[in-house]
Amino acid sequence: MSQNQASSPADAKPATAISRIAALIPGILLCIAVAGVSALLERAELGVFEHPYVEALVMAILLGMALRSFWKPAPRWQAGIAFSAKQLLEVAVMLLGASISFAAIAASGIALLASIAAVVVIALCVSFGLSRLLGLSTRLSILIACGNSICGNSAIAAVAPIIGANNDEIASSISFTAILGVMMVLGLPLLIPLLQLSATQYGILAGLTVYAVPQVLAATVPAGLVSTQIGTLVKLMRVLMLGPVVVGLSLVASRWQSDAKKTNVGFFRLVPWFILGFLALATLRSLEIVPSTVVGPVTKITSFLTVVSMAALGLGVDVRVLANVGGRVTAAVTLSLMLLLGISIALVHWFK
């Protein structure tokens, strides 16, 4: 057999995997570098002011956005940046489960569960109504309502095939989400002293208003571990509302979507892998299979991954995108989010 014979498909698979991993390295290293500078600046603040007024997590977003505003990363950087912004942050969310006991849910009681469901339903109705009043199509209004009220782009991706939304409607509904998501992560902690919120209250507020589970983690880190735990639990409960919403929309859409193909939404579209991992680790922690000595190291790893991911998030946000977003879509998304924030602020004062 000739030594020059072409390699078999089996030999090609490892090479393909290695090349994919290699493609991630430049972008990941860039995000780590931005995160490292952010950590150094936080230490400098601590040395000068004796308090980090702008924490590394927020600094990483701001530095990433500043860098992105005058330098568009070349394609060789993009894969690693995207991986850091999504997968690394999802891993951080999953690991957070190791520090949470389901006793926190039991302590909150049925009132919190009912309140979360009520907020989601009210937000869905108000967001849809506002979007329609602003002249947006029914499908686009549904996408905006689900994205704002449940879990951002994940909800939009799950609902879009159910209602037969086209690419333009999907793009319009998600184009403003990245920027608003960053604004919420940066701005929400400012409400802690302004509204004199406790750690529990702020966690509930973040869980009710921030778009995605990973972003809740980022928004609550400045308020401490208790706030992060509560916020993540509230957000997970909110995400679970996606199932009933999709079922309801499927029943409604089947009546006026006769010309479109019926699409089944898979289980992992409704419940992402990192949420399942979070719940699994939380279960193990509640059963004390995961010992308390693990919580400290896991929390440090989670914090590191979160800062790296926030650097990636900043690097992926181009504020100039605002110029390309339609005025009515921008108004609908912004007003809906403000109303959701107002409802949530009123609610959290019930919980101490």
From Swiss-Prot:
Keyword Transferase: no
Chief location category: membrane
Record carries keyword Protein transport: no
High-level lineage: Bacteria, Pseudomonadati, Pseudomonadota, Alphaproteobacteria, Hyphomicrobiales
Database matches in Pfam families: Cons_hypoth698
Organism the protein comes from: Bradyrhizobium diazoefficiens (strain JCM 10833 / BCRC 13528 / IAM 13628 / NBRC 14792 / USDA 110)
Annotated protein name in UniProt: UPF0324 membrane protein blr3189
Domain of life: Bacteria
InterPro entries: UPF0324_pro
Compartments where found: Cell membrane
Example of a GO cellular component annotation carried by this entry: plasma membrane
Family: Belongs to the UPF0324 family.
Membrane topology: Multi-pass membrane protein
